[in-house]
Amino acid sequence: MKKILALISLMAVFILAACGQTTKTDGATTQTQAAAAEEKSEVTLTNGKEDVTVKTKPKKIVVFDLGVADTIRELGFVDNIVGMPLKTLPAYLKDLPSSIQPTGSMVEPDIEAIAALEPDLIIASGRTIKYLDQLKEIAPTVIFSVDQKDYWNSVSKNIRLVASLFGKEAETKAEEEIKSLEASIKKVADVNEKSTNKTLTLMLNEGKMSAFGADSRFAFLYQSLKFKATDAKIEDSRHGQEMSFEGVKEINPDTIILLNRTLAIGGDNSNADTILNNALFKETNAVKNNRVIQLTSDLWYLSGGGLQSTKLMIEDVKKVLQ
């Protein structure tokens, strides 16, 4: 009798254990199903003129915004890019997969080449916006524009929107990367906020020189990284305000930030050398105190606003703070 009772007890233990395992498995299955249910099948983006409903997990993407391209790469989906303007890529994007096909230039898309790729999604840019109607006939077309008056909030929002195309894991990674970038931004900003140095940003272009203000294409420097602008009134236009050597000397900035557009689009750097050796230029506090930052021109002029490009931009300007 005792043996029978012992056997019954043992069987009961096995049954309970089996039930427990089933419950755990069921629970895991339920969690997996719930996670899958949370994944969106569509997201709503914009092309600057209208909202665009886009299916998530696009397999074939054509990208004209290089900052978005580097965000896609950082999130782990570079193989989903099938076409880009490959002629004038900045150096940091030269190692993209060879499978990516050329789709025209950064300002003039090759419509036939794009159509032949049969993309699920086209990510246009401000430079290609005039081709929007032609592009959206091929595939849903969106633009991730940047608000220069609210630069970092605009960029981080775009990064999150790009991540939303690829699901929860991508969104989680994007949040981690944004948090890391914000920590790096704060380190630079803290140094600049304690400084009294005034900064002038200049662009060199085919022998000419233009100055840019705090709400220009260089807003990241002033709004986010907290470089202090000079007291000079500079028009915040897309191409900047024409500036002479006499004007630079009169402003006498403590820091000068230089971008060579000629170099960015494939020219040489001789203009920068000429300017740096100019007698009036040498009389500024910036040159006297070795506080001239020569930006990585192709990075700042052709790209920006992406996860990787933002990291590199921060590294570019940290040099003068060390």
Annotated model-derived regions:
Residues 118-124, 140, 248, 252-256:
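Proline-aspartate-enriched helix->loop->beta-strand connector
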